[in-house]
Structures are given as structure tokens and as C-alpha cells.
Amino acid sequence: MYADAVTTVGAALRVISAAHTPLQLDFTSYRSPFALTTPEEISRDAEPGRDPFDGYLTRTLVPRLRRSGVDAIGLSICFPGQMVPAYSFALKLKRAFPEAHLVAGGPAITQVLLRLHGPALRQALGAFDSAVVFEGEHTLLSLCRALDEGHTSARELACIPNLVLPDSSSGAGYLPGPPAVDLRGLPAPDFDGLPLDRYWSPQLLLPYDPTRGCYWGRCAFCHYGLTATGTARYRERAVETVVEHLGALSVRHGTRYFYLSQDSVAPKTLGRLADALAESGLDLRWGTDLRPEAQLGPELCARLRRGGAVACSLGVESASPRVLRLIDKGVTPAIVGKAVRNLAQAGIAAEIMCFTDFPTETFDEAMATLRFLEEQAPHIAAFIVGQFELTHGSRVAREPSHFGLRESWIVRGDALGTALFFAERRSSKRARERVRLEQALDRLASGWLLRSYPWAGSLSTAHTIFYYDRFGSGVFRDLSGQAHGQLLGTTPAKQTSRLDLAKLALAEENEAKIWHEITHVRRQISRQTYDRLAAQLPRMRYLRRA
């Protein structure tokens, strides 16, 4: 039944996307071809026929907010895939509540706004009255207190650190303040008011951050979280505070499941936390993300398991020694392999996160990563192999020549500059090698039942942790080869397609060529450019003749 539910929800999302074409919607992304490139495109994507959330917002959310007498509304934009709907929500909320103060915050909007200045920064605010950059607990509290006292103008609010506001002379700006807060002074997260009983989950799993930032902080590809470059400064809560918070949240919300949702946590600290949890008698179950350190020996892994650890996702990145050195990962494949085996032998699901195509990575080096995964397969609970993407605040973007890049660029016409493109000095892989790599990855993945987020079989997710806790850390290897689910309420049937699939495949290939021309050759994006390039292609009849 679970597989059937996954298939049915996936089909529903595809239907929603088709009804709002050219939108592509899933649980991690919300994409339309020209999204966020100009204020006009932002407004276009907010139109009712293009926004699947329009009915909910106008018929449910706005009346609910109106009944509450709201005078301040905040939108947290954590992930890039949330940017488009956030701007759409902002336009409609401002239209419905012109007197309310509308504020944005979160990692995704922070990393956009920090790169912009003056008029460009003002344009990026869109319909928002303000935006919080960096970690926002103190800034948001100061804003709410100021609004409560009747201070509503940008001039009156300009004294609040890290609050981006319109400015009549410069366009927009903010008073710089400390980017990171004192984690030890913060209370436990507050989930009151959220409809936790309506989440698609058989049980409740809550996120909790025992630390913030990264204690290593040197990986060249990384620009993550609420920071201008790299990663934020590492901070920890006291172990006794973490245990107290987790215990209180467990009782209040009736759950024993948590995800320790920090960027990284020092192994020594995690060991002390596991010991304290074991001694507390709380009997919690948790997962987290870790660096694959040499300290993850058999004794520490056994302590983690006794303290309730169910799964640990390891940021492995690559199994090529040269690529790891270039990244400045600080570990070797041998260290990673031992950490994986020690976790697995302790009964903890060891999940592996890798990626290919780091600048200058060769085909042989990418294949070394896949061979490593194959060798460690008996100990790996699940894995993902992504593809490198260049991010603005990473060391690769700041020092491109050191990493073999000829150049990097933002295409003209992209007002927010959300996409960063690059070219290597020398192409590291041929086209046919990329095909071979994808084929090898498909063969490797067939040894597990792997799914996309947020389903069981994806990494660092609630459903996956529940599966590990119930069926053991090898459950997704055991389920490999399981048939795909069926649409609920339907009968399987075969039908001849009305569409010419060969022509559809050719159309997809042509679409990719158009976007390569736009992003890598002309380096300018607009509907006019797209239309001119599309007009140069021969027209095709996609419906089969009767």
C-alpha cells in the first residue's frame, strides 16, 4: 500500500503541474522556465491559472488571517524551491492586507539578498516590506516589538540589525549586525499552532538543532545556511539543555522521534549527548547528519546506538583521494569506509551522500566513487549521488582559477542572479563518458529501493527513519527490486499512446539545446530570446495520425 500511495501522490503532482503548465512541481522544487528572472515574471507566476496554491490562499488562508486581525505576516523561505511560491504568496497577501507588515526570512532569501545592493536589493524585496538576513531570532523579535509600539515606517525600523528595508535614497539596505546568535541563549523550538496531526506521516518526527554551523568549515563546494560565505561559525547547546529540550518536546507532542537537523556536530559532543540520552531513560529515536570522521570508531558508534541513534547520513562527497584533497574534505576513502562499517555494525543505518562533476573530476575519479559505494554496499543503508552545482558563496566561486574553472557567470536578464554557471578550463568528461557514468549509477542503485524526498528510501527523512526503526538498517537493500506501486482506485491497463513518443523525445532534446544556447552561449535570458530560438526549429506534429 505504501508504494501505491507514493505512486498516486506522484501522479497527482504531475497532474497539478500539467494543469498549471509550464510549472513543474514536486516536493523539493517549484520550477517554471523564466521564474524569478524579472518582476514581471514573478507577477506572471502569481496569476491564478499558473499558481496551484491560489485557491488555498484566497479562499482559506486570507479569510483565516483576516479573522485573526493580523498586522504582521512572516514567510520563512528555507530552500531555493520555495522562492517562487513565496513571492507569489507575498504579492497576494500584500494585496489582501496592505496595512500589514510583510517580512521574509530564511537561508534561501538570505543568500539572494546578501549579493545585491541598492536598487537591485529593493527590487528583490518585491512585495515584502522587509526581510531578515542571517539567523533571525533576535531580529524578528525586535521587529515585532517595534511594530507593537507603533513604529511602522522604514526610517523607524532602520535601527534593527540585519533587517533589509527600502530606502528612498539608496534603494534598500540594512544595518549590519552579528550573523550568528548565541545558541545557548535560545529556547527550544516552538511547534505550537502547527497542524502536526495533518502531516503525511504515520508518526510524528520533530526537527531539533543541538548545534549550528560547521566545526570543519573548509569544504570548497559548501555555501550552506545563514551566512555570507562558506558555512556559519560552529556553536553548540549544552548537552543537558538538549536532553531537557528533547524530553519536553517528546512529552508535549507525544513522540519519541527526532531529527537532529544541524549542519554538523562534533563526534565527541554527539557521544556525550548519546550517553546522556541513554541515562535519561527517555527512549528516543533519532537520526542526524555527520562528517565521516576517524573518531567514528566501534566504541563511539555503539554509544550512539545505545543513545537512540537510528540513522546517520555521512557527507562523503567523493571517493577519489585527489578530489577529496581539492575539496579540502579532511578525510580519506579509508577513513570513510571504516566509519560506514562501524556505524552499520552498531546497528545504525549509514546513509551516504556523494556527488559527481566537482571541477576537474575525471571519468575515472567519478567511477571510483561508484566503486566505493559498490564495495561498501553491504554496510550502506541508502545513498544519493548528486551533481555538483556552483553556489555563490562557496570557495570554488570565490577562487575559480584554483579549481580549474575558466570563468563563471550569471546570465543577463536574471534580476536575482539565482543561477550561477561555469566553464572548466579543460572539459573533464566526454559526453559518452557521462552516459556510461549514468548507466553505472543506475546499475548500482538497483541494489536498493531508493526513492525521492520525502518518501521512505530517501535520505534524512521521517519515513525512512521509521522504516529503519521497524525493519532494521538493511531494509532498503532487502526491498530492492520491489515493483512500483499502482495508482490507488485504478485498474492496470495498457493503451496505445496518442502521442508520437519519438517526436516528444526529440522535442525534449531541442528544448535542452535552446536552454544551453541561452545560458552558455548567449548568456541572456528572456522570453523573446527563447521564442526566437524556438522559431528556428522545424514544427512537429506530436499527435499520431488516426
Name each model feature, range by range.
Residues 152-158, 172-175, 234, 256-258, ...:
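Acidic/polar loop patches that form or flank catalytic/metal-binding clefts of enzymes
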Residues 1-23, 38, 68, 423-546:
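Radical SAM enzyme core and accessory elements
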Residues 1-70, 88, 95-98, 114, ...:
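Conserved Radical SAM active-site core
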Residues 75-79, 260-263, 290, 356:
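Short glycine-centered, acidic/aromatic-flanked micro-motifs in structured strand/loop junctions
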Residues 75, 104, 133, 224, ...:
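Conserved beta-strand positions
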Residues 70, 128, 236, 280-285, ...:
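A structural motif corresponding to the C-terminal lobe/cap of the Radical SAM core domain
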Residues 32-176:
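Glycine-rich beta-alpha loop elements in corrinoid/cobalamin-binding modules
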Residues 184-349, 371:
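Radical SAM [4Fe-4S] cluster-binding motif and immediate context
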